Amino acid sequence: GAKKLLQTLRAAGLRVYILSATRHALLDPAIERLGVAPLVDGVYAEEETGSKRTEAPYAFFRDRLGVPYEKMLLVEDAPRNLAAAEALGVSGVGVYDESMKEYTEMIRAGAAVYLPDFSDLSALEELLR
């Protein structure tokens, strides 16, 4: 599922970066195991950029890549992170996660697009046009 999502983002001509709350010691092997490393331009942990609940990681990518907030896209399963991004003008794509199922409606409400799974990415493709 996630691989299809990354391929869709790439096909739209986007640079793709992974930012996770997970530390590199666990994150990097997972990315390799899933076979998605060739689909991303970089991998960062919040320990490097700051929490997604704050402006810090978005400012990090803005300053490092020269991408204004309104040109960024956050794919996220946590409503607080989507809200923080939206407050800055970053578009959010909400995704379903079993561990966050009690927050599904908040995630759906806080996202420009909501993906209950990765089987149908047409709403995302429409957003990217």
Segments from the language model and where they lie:
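Short, acidic loop-to-helix structural element flanking the phosphoryl-transfer center
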Residues: 1-18, 24, 28, 55
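Asp-based, Mg2+/Mn2+-dependent phosphohydrolase catalytic module
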Residues: 24, 28-129
